[in-house]
């Protein structure tokens, strides 16, 4: 009998009934399937229920050897994953009102979820961030932010008038019409021989300086005068009448002023009218020197 007992080896399965063994196998399979099918971000309630489904023998043995460790939760891989906390930043002031209201709603829901999980599991879940907080961090609305500088630049562009050439004080009728410009004779240029009309100066500004050169006086006198182009039938008569008008208006009595007047007529008109101009000037000169009244 003793020899038989010495050769026979007892196993742990011989001491337990077969029904217990089948139950333990089924529990281990269900726990493995539950861990594989569950997502990475398990909620606090699911984590606590999965811990309660462990085998009773392991729990009894752990409480017998480590009585203080029964209060602390067992370590698991899912708990280590959740320890890595993500920093949550406050929303910037550039967000719209609609986005801020939605964020407030999300923060309220996340705070209520955290309160339920704290009451169910314990104080150690304070370090773990809930999935609602992760949704709060990753906001899928990139177009909700608006730059304040862009709004100011758009307002400034709206204030600028469309057409810079038109001033706000002028009416559209006056803005369309170009201003009247007086064309002056800037340089002493002899006109071409095939010109159709004669040119008559209308105004000559006299200078009181006695000492001046003939060239400078001629150029300045012509620059400050205006010329009118006329088509004439009797050019000698027209030249004579215009010379008399110029002498009477400007009160020309000095020889230098009369010479400037003659040079002005010669420079404005072509060479074909020079003989006619000289004849008209001689007639007016004779009348002035003799002191006779100028008859038209």
From Swiss-Prot:
Residues 78-88 have a biased composition (Basic residues). PROSITE patterns: OVATE. One of its GO terms (cellular component) is nucleus. One of its GO terms (molecular function) is DNA binding. Residues 27-115, 131-196 are annotated as: Disordered. The keyword Repressor applies. InterPro entries: DNA_bnd_dom_ovate, Ovate, Ovate_C. Residues 228-287 form the OVATE domain. It is found in: Nucleus. Residues 92-115 have a biased composition (Low complexity). Keywords: Nucleus, Repressor, Transcription, Transcription regulation. GO terms for biological process: negative regulation of DNA-templated transcription. Its main location: nucleus. PANTHER family: TRANSCRIPTION REPRESSOR OFP3, TRANSCRIPTION REPRESSOR OFP7-RELATED. Transcriptional repressor that may regulate multiple aspects of plant growth and development through the regulation of BEL1-LIKE (BLH) and KNOX TALE (KNAT) homeodomain transcription factors. This is Transcription repressor OFP3.
């Amino acid at each position: 009998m003793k020899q038989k007992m010495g050769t026979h080896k007892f196993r742990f399965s011989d001491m337990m009934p077969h029904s217990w063994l089948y139950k333990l196998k089924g529990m281990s399979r269900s726990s493995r399937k539950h861990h594989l099918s569950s997502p990475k971000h398990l909620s606090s309630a699911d984590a606590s229920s999965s811990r309660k489904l462990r085998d009773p023998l392991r729990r009894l043995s752990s409480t017998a050897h480590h009585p203080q460790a029964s209060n602390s939760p067992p370590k698991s891989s899912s708990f280590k994953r959740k320890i890595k906390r993500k920093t949550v930043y406050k929303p910037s002031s550039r967000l719209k009102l609609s986005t801020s209201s939605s964020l407030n709603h999300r923060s309220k829901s996340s705070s209520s979820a955290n309160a339920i999980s704290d009451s169910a599991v314990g104080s150690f879940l304070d370090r773990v961030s809930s999935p609602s907080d992760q949704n709060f961090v990753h906001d899928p609305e990139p177009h909700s932010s608006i730059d304040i500088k862009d709004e100011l630049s758009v307002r400034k562009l709206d204030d600028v008038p469309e057409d810079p050439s038109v001033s706000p004080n002028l009416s559209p009728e006056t803005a369309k019409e170009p201003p009247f410009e007086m064309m002056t004779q800037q340089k002493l240029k002899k006109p071409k021989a095939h010109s159709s009309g004669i040119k008559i100066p209308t105004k000559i500004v006299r200078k009181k300086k006695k000492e001046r050169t003939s060239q400078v006086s001629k150029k300045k006198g012509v620059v400050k005068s205006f010329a009118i182009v006329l088509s004439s039938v009797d050019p000698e008569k027209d030249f004579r009448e215009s010379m008399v008008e110029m002498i009477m208006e400007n009160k020309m009595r000095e020889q230098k002023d009369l010479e400037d007047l003659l040079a002005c007529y010669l420079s404005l008109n072509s060479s074909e009218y020079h003989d006619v101009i000289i004849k008209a000037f001689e007639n007016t000169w004779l009348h002035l020197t003799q002191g006779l009244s100028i008859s038209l």
